């Protein structure tokens, strides 16, 4: 079995009940920190630009919320604005060896999808842990040399967000 298949199997089989209590508590702390980072961007010039873009390009309302304004929009645009908001003030978490800011990409996507799919807090935590696991492991595999050319949060973070949302959607290891 390849490393990719092993990781996909691990993530697909991951269940809330098997996550250590300390990991769940840390994930809750990271989630609150992420919300604080997003709210800290309130009033910063770029955020209204992202919100106006979401307003013009997206639906008038939707199933997911923008943290800073409380406005509802599509999950796609809520994740976009919340991700930008939470990364703007550079207070979001950093995992050093993967050179990744996982909260920005994982929580933004997972919260928007969880709202859209009417998922529970447990589901949100499980999906977030899966997204963090994927992002950190892939980021560590890519190594620091990847960061010399690419912004790991943008490249590896895309995969981390996809894994988190896939977990909410019930994807199996092949998906």
Predicted regions and their residues:
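N-terminal core-entry segment
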Residues: 1-175
């Amino acid at each position: 079995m390849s490393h990719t298949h092993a990781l996909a199997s691990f993530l697909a089989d991951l269940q809330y009940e098997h996550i250590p209590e300390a990991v769940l508590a840390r994930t809750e702390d990271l989630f609150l920190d992420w919300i604080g980072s997003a709210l800290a961007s309130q009033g910063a010039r770029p955020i209204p630009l992202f919100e106006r873009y979401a307003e013009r390009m997206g639906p008038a309302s939707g199933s997911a919320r923008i943290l800073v304004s409380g406005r509802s929009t599509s999950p796609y645009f809520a994740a976009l604005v919340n991700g930008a908001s939470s990364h703007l003030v550079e207070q979001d978490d950093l995992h050093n060896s993967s050179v990744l800011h996982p909260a920005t990409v994982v929580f933004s996507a997972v919260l928007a999808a969880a709202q859209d799919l009417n998922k529970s807090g447990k589901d949100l935590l499980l999906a977030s842990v899966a997204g963090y696991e994927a992002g950190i492991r892939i980021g560590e595999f890519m190594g620091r040399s990847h960061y010399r050319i690419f912004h790991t949060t943008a490249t590896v973070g895309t995969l981390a967000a996809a894994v988190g949302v896939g977990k909410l959607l019930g994807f199996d290891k092949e998906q």
